[in-house]
């Protein structure tokens, strides 16, 4: 079983972090740690979206060759 979180799990965790930080009830040290964790999750989400976009841009023709579509 893989320990890698799904896109949806990462998004939920990022939303939770943002909510905690928005309350303002977090100690400064904890807020910095949460912010850093959120930034890492955000980068992972962006990477996943980029990979998905690259996959969707390719379309297989009937003969099996790939065609790049305009984005």
From Swiss-Prot:
* Subunit description: Heterooligomer composed of large and small subunits.
Q: Which GO terms describe its cellular component?
A: cytosol; exodeoxyribonuclease VII complex
Organism, scientific name: Streptococcus agalactiae serotype V (strain ATCC BAA-611 / 2603 V/R)
Gene that encodes it: xseB
Gene3D superfamilies the record matches: Exonuclease VII, small subunit
List all disulphide bridges recorded for this chain. none
- From the UniProt record, give one GO term of the biological process aspect: DNA catabolic process
Subcellular location per the Swiss-Prot or TrEMBL entry: Cytoplasm
Q: Does the keyword Nuclease apply?
A: yes
Origin, by domain of life? Bacteria
Family affiliation: Belongs to the XseB family.
One protein family per Pfam: Exonuc_VII_S
Gene Ontology molecular function: exodeoxyribonuclease VII activity
Q: What EC number is given for this enzyme?
A: 3.1.11.6
Which InterPro entries does the record cross-reference, listed alphabetically?
Exonuc_VII_S (IPR003761), Exonuc_VII_ssu_sf (IPR037004)
The main enzyme category here is hydrolase
Reaction(s) the record says it catalyses: Exonucleolytic cleavage in either 5'- to 3'- or 3'- to 5'-direction to yield nucleoside 5'-phosphates
Q: What does this protein do?
A: Bidirectionally degrades single-stranded DNA into large acid-insoluble oligonucleotides, which are then degraded further into small acid-soluble oligonucleotides.
**What is the protein name given in its UniProt record?**
Exodeoxyribonuclease 7 small subunit
Listed A to Z, the keywords are: Cytoplasm, Exonuclease, Hydrolase, Nuclease
